[in-house]
Curated annotation (Swiss-Prot):
Belongs to the class-II aminoacyl-tRNA synthetase family. Type-1 seryl-tRNA synthetase subfamily. Its main location: cytoplasm. Its EC number is 6.1.1.11. InterPro entries: aa-tRNA-synt_IIb, aa-tRNA-synth_II, aa-tRNA-synth_II/BPL/LPL, Ser-tRNA-ligase_type_1, Ser-tRNA-synth_1_N, SerRS_1_N_sf, SerRS_core, tRNA-bd_arm. PROSITE patterns: AA_TRNA_LIGASE_II. This is Serine--tRNA ligase. It comes from Campylobacter fetus subsp. fetus (strain 82-40). GO terms for molecular function: ATP binding; serine-tRNA ligase activity. The gene is serS. Keywords: Aminoacyl-tRNA synthetase, ATP-binding, Cytoplasm, Ligase, Nucleotide-binding, Protein biosynthesis. SUPFAM superfamilies: Class II aaRS and biotin synthetases, tRNA-binding arm.
Length: 414
C-alpha cells in the first residue's frame, strides 16, 4: 500500500508516477479526498470526546457539592449520541479508504523508463551469444513429444488445457533443475524454507494479490484458503505483523513450490507447450531489508539468477521494465529473458522486483532500530522458473536427430 501521508504532501509527483502505470487521476484524487475527509472527521470525533470528558468531570464536581446536574447530564447524553454518529462515520471512512487504497498500485522508482507497453522495456545487457544451428531448431513441445518427455494429451485428460505430465528423462531433468537451483541459491546465502501451498486471504492481501487480482486465483470453496500463485506470498508473509531486530536484516530466503494461476487474461496466448500453464513450478528468492539496502539487494538477486543461467549455458538478456509494464506491487523490476531458438526470440524466465515498503505497509512488517520502528523493504523474484528453464535447455541443447544434451552442471543431479 502506498504512503498516504506522502500523497498529501506530494500529490503531483505521485499522480505523475501512477499515471505512468496507467492509473486514472480520479483514483488518486478520490483516495486523497477520502483521506482528508477521514482526518477531518477524526478531529471532530476527538473534539466531541474532549467535550464528553470535560462535562463528565464537571458533573462529578457538581454532584459532590450537592448542585443540580440534570442539565449537564442531558448535555452528556446528547453529546454521546453525536460521538456515536461521528464514530460510525469514521469507521465507514476508514473502510472506504482501505478499499480504495488497497487497489492503488505502487509508485515507480525515479530511474524506471516511461513507456506504454512491453515494447518500451529497455535492454540493459545481453549475456552469452545464441548458438548457431546447422539445422532448423525445433520448439520444445515437438522435441518433448517425440522424446516422450512431455505428455500434453494426458495432462489435458486429467485436468484440462494448460496442464502437462512430465515423463521419463523430462521428469528427471525437472527434478534435477529444482535441486540445482536450491543448491545454487543457498550457496549465495539464501535460507531454504518450505511453506504451505494454501494461504488465507490476509496473506494474499499482504503481498498485494487481494483484493485486486482475485479472478486470477484458485479459491477453495467455502474456505478462506487459496492456492498460491507464487511462493513469494507465503514466504514474504512469514514476517507478517512482526517487528524484526535490525541486526537480523537482511533476511534472504529461497523456496521451491508449485504455483497455480487461472491466467484469466491469457486466452489465445501460448496455447501450445509449457510456456503458460495453470500449474507450474519455480524456485523463488525473497529478501527483506532496511530501506537503504534494497537497491543493492535487487542487484544481488538479479546477479544470482543471471549467474545461474550462465552456469547452465543459456543465452539471456536483462530487461528493465517500463512504467506501464510493471506489476501492481513493484517499484522497479528487472526481467531476465532467455533465448529460445525454436521460437527465435527471448522469453521471460525470471522477474525480480523491489516493492520497497509497499508490501511491508500492507503486511505490517517492520524492523526495530534503537527505539524506532520502521517499515522494511521487500524484494522477490524467480531463480528460476523451472518449466521455462527446462524448455530453454531442450531448445538450446537439441541435436539434429531430436536428442537433447544435458548441461554439464546438471549431470550429477540426474
Amino acid at each position: 500500500m502506498i504512503n498516504l501521508k506522502l500523497i498529501e504532501t506530494n500529490f503531483d509527483e505521485f499522480n505523475a508516477k501512477l499515471k505512468a502505470k496507467k492509473v486514472d487521476e480520479g483514483v488518486l484524487k478520490n483516495l486523497l479526498d477520502t483521506y482528508n475527509e477521514l482526518k477531518i472527521k477524526k478531529q471532530e470525533l476527538e473534539n466531541l470526546q474532549a467535550v464528553q470528558n470535560a462535562k463528565s468531570k464537571e458533573v462529578g464536581i457538581l454532584a459532590r457539592s450537592g448542585a443540580d446536574t440534570t442539565l449537564l447530564k442531558t448535555e452528556l447524553e446528547e453529546n454521546k449520541k453525536l460521538m456515536q454518529t461521528a464514530s460510525n462515520l469514521v469507521s465507514e471512512l476508514e473502510t472506504k479508504l482501505d478499499t480504495v487504497a488497497s487497489r492503488v498500485p505502487n509508485v515507480i522508482d525515479d530511474d524506471v523508463p516511461l513507456g506504454k507497453d512491453d515494447n518500451d522495456n529497455v535492454c540493459i545487457k545481453t549475456i552469452l551469444e545464441p548458438r548457431e544451428f546447422n539445422f532448423t531448431p525445433k520448439e520444445h513441445f515437438e522435441l518433448g513429444e517425440n522424446l516422450g518427455w512431455l505428455d500434453f494429451a494426458t495432462g489435458a485428460k486429467l485436468s484440462g488445457s494448460r496442464f502437462t505430465v512430465l515423463r521419463s528423462d523430462g521428469a528427471r531433468l525437472s527434478r534435477a533443475l529444482v535441486n540445482f537451483m536450491i543448491d545454487f541459491n543457498t550457496a549465495r546465502g539464501f535460507e531454504l524454507v518450505n511453506v504451505p501451498f494454501l494461504v488465507n486471504s490476509n496473506t494474499l492481501y499482504g503481498t498485494g494479490q487481494l483484493p485486486k487480482f482475485e479472478e486470477d486465483l484458485y479459491k477453495i470453496r467455502d474456505e478462506d484458503l487459496y492456492l498460491i500463485p507464487t511462493s513469494e506470498v507465503p514466504v514474504t508473509n512469514i514476517y507478517n505483523n512482526e517487528i524484526i531486530p535490525v541486526e537480523n536484516l537482511p533476511i534472504k530466503m529461497t523456496c521451491y513450490s508449485a504455483c497455480f494461476r487461472q491466467e484469466a487474461g491469457s486466452a489465445g496466448r501460448d496455447t501450445r507447450g509449457m510456456i503458460r500453464q495453470h500449474q507450474f513450478e519455480k524456485v523463488e528468492l525473497v529478501s527483506i531489508s532496511k530501506p537503504e539496502d534494497s537497491a543493492k539487494i535487487l542487484d544481488e538477486m538479479v546477479s544470482c539468477a543471471s549467474d545461474m543461467l550462465k552456469e547452465l549455458g543459456l543465452p539471456h538478456r536483462h530487461m528493465m521494465l517500463c512504467s506501464a509494464d510493471l506489476g501492481f506491487g513493484a517499484a522497479k523490476t528487472i526481467d531476465l529473458e532467455v533465448w529460445l531458438p525454436g521460437q527465435g526470440k527471448y522469453r521471460e524466465i525470471s522477474s525480480i522486483s523491489n516493492t520497497r515498503d509497499f508490501q511491508a505497509r500492507r503486511a505490517k512488517i517492520r524492523y526495530k532500530d534503537g527505539k524506532k520502528n520502521a517499515l522494511v523493504h521487500t524484494l522477490n523474484g524467480s531463480s528460476l522458473a523451472v518449466g521455462r528453464t527446462l524448455i530453454a535447455i531442450m531448445e538450446n541443447y537439441q541435436n539434429s536427430d531430436g536428442s537433447i544434451n544435458i548441461p554439464e552442471v546438471l549431470k550429477k543431479y540426474m
